[in-house]
Amino acid sequence: MTTEELEAAARAWIAAWNSHDLEAILAHYADGIVFQTPTAVARWGRADGVLRGKDELRRHFARGLELCPTLHFELEQIFTGPDGYAVLYRRENESRVIDTVELDGNGQAVRGRALYAGKQA
């Protein structure tokens, strides 16, 4: 993917989250996604914070949207690389987050990680 395509994918990801449309969010992820986030530790007691597969991600993201009906991401910066991107954004609770995303040949996330500075939802 070109830098422009990666930046467009990152902006579309932010827009999907801000729409609160779970299916639009999940459309950015491959079925075999491996996603690591501190919120999986808090919500599901997973010491490694790893969620595997779209079904686990669906459950996790649905719970996140329930817990935070005012969720909003304000994009601060996009970083791109050969096979993915990272986004730095500010949440509605003022915490800053970096999400890193590794993409497959179809432009869907196969590996991701969320890193928080401040409050986690």
Which residues fall in each region the model found?
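A solvent-exposed, acidic/Ser-Thr-rich amphipathic alpha-helical stretch
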Residues: 3, 24, 30-81
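Hydrophobic pocket/interface hotspot
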Residues: 13, 25, 33, 53, ...
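Short, low-complexity N-terminal intrinsically disordered segments enriched in polar/charged residues
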Residues: 1-27, 31, 120-121
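A beta-strand edge to alpha-helix "cap/lid" segment located at domain peripheries
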Residues: 2, 58, 65-121
